[in-house]
Amino acid sequence: MFYVYVLKSLKNGRFYTGSTNNLKRRLFEHNIGQTKYTKGAGPFELIYKEVYNTRLEANRREKFLKTGKERELLKQILGT
């Protein structure tokens, strides 16, 4: 299983989108500052996730969620 996820920083309120095959481990890495783009912005809470059968599907969805139109739709869905 592969996951696409959205995290919210409890420190600055920003959202971060990513993909992984181990959601629990990846959230832990974000929270202890082991990731390049979110280092220093934690702690984080998981606010959204989707599950896919392949890495390719998850990577495509992650890329799509990071585009302008889809990012705005996701913000509306999440109520932000």
Which stretches of residues belong to each language-model region?
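GIY-YIG nuclease catalytic motif and its immediate N-terminal context
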Residues: 1-35, 40-42, 49-52, 56-66, ...
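A short, polar/charged loop-to-alpha-helix boundary motif
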Residues: 71-77
